[in-house]
From Swiss-Prot:
One of its GO terms (molecular function) is DNA binding. Protamines substitute for histones in the chromatin of sperm during the haploid phase of spermatogenesis. They compact sperm DNA into a highly condensed, stable and inactive complex. This is Sperm protamine P1. GO terms for cellular component: nucleosome; nucleus. The keyword DNA-binding applies. Its main location: nucleus. It comes from the Eukaryota. It comes from Glauconycteris beatrix (Beatrix's bat). Keywords: Chromosome, Developmental protein, Differentiation, DNA condensation, DNA-binding, Nucleosome core, Nucleus, Spermatogenesis. One of its GO terms (biological process) is chromosome condensation.
Length: 46
């Protein structure tokens, strides 16, 4: 599966949606690298 790289700063995730930014567009951590959650498809692919 393709992984999505998290935005440079966490503020970007919050900026997308203020209300449901916690559940849908939240920055996740995976294997040391910061990866965006599966729902956060706006991030760039890695």
């Amino acid at each position: 599966m393709a992984r999505y790289r998290c935005c440079r700063s966490r503020s970007r995730c919050r900026r997308r949606r203020r209300r449901s930014y916690r559940r849908r567009r939240r920055c996740c951590r995976r294997r040391r690298r910061r990866v965006c959650c599966r729902r956060y498809v706006r991030c760039r692919r890695r």
